[in-house]
Amino acid sequence: MKKLDKFFVNPDIKKADTLPSSFYKNDQQFEDVKEKVFANSWQFVGHKSILPINTNTYPFEFMDGFIEEPLLLVKDQDENLKCLSNVCTHRANIIIHNKGQVKDLKCLYHGRKFDLDGNFKSMPEFKKAIDFPRECESLKEFKLKNLGPFIFVGLEPNFKIDNVFSRIYDRISFLNL
């Protein structure tokens, strides 16, 4: 039995019961559920101004100090944003350490290069390697959505944030975001 299986909340509110108080006080139980809950959610990254003119990369942690997944916002020439893994697919080195302007993404460990879409481009001394590159050599792309100028990212979101955004827009449409 999984650690989380012992907790059940009936989806019918008439039959639902409150979780035991130990659930809220036990650090290990919190650690067991935090990734299950938050890795499946959308998180606010920032305002689009974090990528000003002459800046096309912005490294960040998914939930800094909580779920530390190194991610990278990348802005293309048309101002479109993508969220990519900021971890090299070769030796798990961080690729971009500071926001800035780059023409491609280069891992400083072994020189592996990726384009701004995260596609593998090259690696020194691997030109003659058989069955290389493979699809898994490219950087993983994560879901990204905007609410006006605000950027949200999800690792593996289990709901569509557009449903949330539509309700927010209903309430704040007068703000002209």
Task: Locate the predicted segments by residue.
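Residues immediately within or flanking Cys/His clusters that coordinate Zn2+
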Residues: 82-85, 104
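Residue-level signal for short segments within beta-strands and strand-turn junctions
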Residues: 75, 85-87
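Short cysteine-rich clusters marking metal-coordination/redox-active sites
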Residues: 88, 107
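Rieske [2Fe-2S] iron-sulfur-binding subdomain
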Residues: 1-80, 101, 115-177
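Active-site gating/metal-coordination segments in enzymes
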Residues: 91
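Short, non-ligating residues that shape and space the ligands of small metal-coordination modules
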Residues: 94-97, 114-116
